């Protein structure tokens, strides 16, 4: 739409000087023809040539003006096109800058959000590590207490067992020593008497 308007303005600026030029040439031709008709009655060749030369000069000057006007019109059109292109490029650059700033703000927000999430994750990991550390320490203490209790119970049982064994051994040794002492102290008559008493008691039981 903008290019069509520019072309229309350019065509209008060219047509106006061309129309003026055509009108001037037409008037010059008519004047020259009229003078030529009058010259048939009273011929003045020198004056006609001089007038013709001036008309040629006028025509050349007019043609130069027309060419200058056309070039100026083309220059204005080219300048307008260049201005439009520059304005378009500036608009596109501004739009690109706005889009880049929008993207930058968007990515900055995402980066900030990601940093916050990373901080939260790091804090959660540290908290979980502290809880795990405390749990491991508590389990280690509980295990150590159980081991100490088991060791104490085992030691106590071993002590009781050793005491029982020592008592049994002491009783056995005491019996052996008593038997030996009796053997040494009891005479043959006492042995026979003890045997007879034992047999009598057995018979009485039956």
UniProtKB/Swiss-Prot annotation:
Transmembrane segments annotated in the record for this chain: 14-34
Family: Belongs to the ATPase B chain family.
Superkingdom of origin organism: Bacteria
Subcellular compartments: Cell inner membrane
Species of provenance: Geobacter metallireducens (strain ATCC 53774 / DSM 7210 / GS-15)
GO molecular function, one term: proton-transporting ATP synthase activity, rotational mechanism
Membrane topology: Single-pass membrane protein
Chief site of localization: membrane
Functional summary from the UniProt entry: F(1)F(0) ATP synthase produces ATP from ADP in the presence of a proton or sodium gradient. F-type ATPases consist of two structural domains, F(1) containing the extramembraneous catalytic core and F(0) containing the membrane proton channel, linked together by a central stalk and a peripheral stalk. During catalysis, ATP synthesis in the catalytic domain of F(1) is coupled via a rotary mechanism of the central stalk subunits to proton translocation. Component of the F(0) channel, it forms part of the peripheral stalk, linking F(1) to F(0).
Keyword Cytoplasm (UniProt): no
Subunit structure: F-type ATPases have 2 components, F(1) - the catalytic core - and F(0) - the membrane proton channel. F(1) has five subunits: alpha(3), beta(3), gamma(1), delta(1), epsilon(1). F(0) has three main subunits: a(1), b(2) and c(10-14). The alpha and beta chains form an alternating ring which encloses part of the gamma chain. F(1) is attached to F(0) by a central stalk formed by the gamma and epsilon chains, while a peripheral stalk is formed by the delta and b chains.
Pfam assignment, any one: ATP-synt_B
Keyword annotations of the record: ATP synthesis, Cell inner membrane, Cell membrane, CF(0), Hydrogen ion transport, Ion transport, Membrane, Transmembrane, Transmembrane helix, Transport
PANTHER family with a match to the protein in the record: ATP SYNTHASE SUBUNIT B, CHLOROPLASTIC
Coiled coil (UniProt feature): none
Segment forming the signal sequence: none
Family annotation (InterPro entries): ATP_synth_b/b'su_bac/chlpt
One GO location term (cellular component): plasma membrane
Protein name (database record): ATP synthase subunit b
Record keyword Mitochondrion present: no
């Amino acid at each position: 739409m903008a290019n069509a308007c520019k072309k229309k303005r350019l065509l209008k600026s060219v047509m106006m000087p061309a129309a003026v030029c055509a009108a001037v040439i037409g008037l010059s031709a008519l004047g020259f023809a009229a003078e030529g008709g009058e010259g048939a009655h009273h011929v003045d060749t020198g004056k006609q040539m001089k007038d013709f030369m001036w008309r040629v000069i006028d025509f050349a000057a007019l043609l130069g003006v027309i060419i200058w006007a056309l070039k100026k019109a083309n220059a204005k059109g080219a300048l307008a096109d260049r201005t439009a292109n520059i304005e378009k490029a500036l608009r596109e650059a501004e739009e690109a800058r706005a889009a880049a700033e929008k993207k930058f703000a968007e990515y900055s927000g995402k980066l900030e959000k990601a940093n916050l999430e990373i901080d939260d994750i790091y804090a959660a990991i540290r908290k979980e590590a502290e809880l795990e550390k405390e749990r491991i320490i508590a389990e280690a203490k509980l295990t150590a207490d159980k081991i100490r209790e088991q060791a104490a119970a085992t030691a106590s049982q071993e002590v009781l067992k050793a005491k029982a064994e020592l008592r049994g051994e002491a009783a056995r040794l005491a019996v052996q020593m008593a038997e030996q002492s009796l053997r040494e102290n009891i005479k043959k008559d006492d042995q026979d008497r003890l045997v007879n008493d034992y047999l009598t008691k057995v018979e009485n039981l039956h």
